[in-house]
Amino acid sequence: MIEAWNYDSGDGEMCWAAAASNMLHWWVALNADYIEKYDNEFPSSPSGFTRPSFDYKDNVEEQSPIFRFFIERSPNQPGSTWHSLNWFLTAGNYIPLSDSRWKDFPGFFCEVLGNKTLVSPEEITGPSRSKFNEIIKSALTNRQAIGFSASGMQFGGTVPHAMTIWGAEFDENGEVSYIYYVDNNDGFLQDATEGSVCIRQKMTYHSLNNGGGYDVPHIQSSLGPNYDSPIVRLCVLGLERDKWAKKYGVLPLPGDDRTE
């Protein structure tokens, strides 16, 4: 779990980068065998751009070299998790840059995944009840990491806060009833979560501000439905095992006796 508030260079607006970093750590861990082959074939690609370490460090101050990488190249301002994923892997989207030397960056895995391709295919804004459930079920079935943004999660208000979903529970109708999510700002929630990495939270479905219109997925608030946090954005990241296998052959997925 990556904390967006522990770094001293200013990152209070960079939850988008912290959420993307969480997803990228998952991605590189499960693609480690393919990445080793990639590095053997393309040891200096992309030329002139140094990739951050993928080692996840077990200390609060410097857990994620990937997140540090984003902090050192982007200004402390709002951004997009979806853009960050595609930019890091293939330069398929843009991110705000404070370092102009990276404006021609082609992506760290462009030799296999392609340059300027969308590894994360789309960002869903304002998902309906049915669309939210469709995306969660598909992502969990197809081994995809899930990024999301919810309004009102940090200090109230309507500003979206970016986080990641890693699991779900379903009710008797097959709808998501609880999510297991990681909040990169959960240092503010240590008492409530008792130090847990994943937070289990009930989902509700109702119109925005209970004002009519279609049902929207909300993270339930203990203060009542008027304080529930609507999920306003979703994106997913697949492992791209088909592209890896086309280049290097089929390898077993770590921790799974099946192959892709």
Ranges and model annotations:
Residues 8-127:
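Cysteine-nucleophile protease catalytic domains, especially the papain-like/related folds used
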Residues 126-142, 147-260:
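Active-site signature of cysteine proteases
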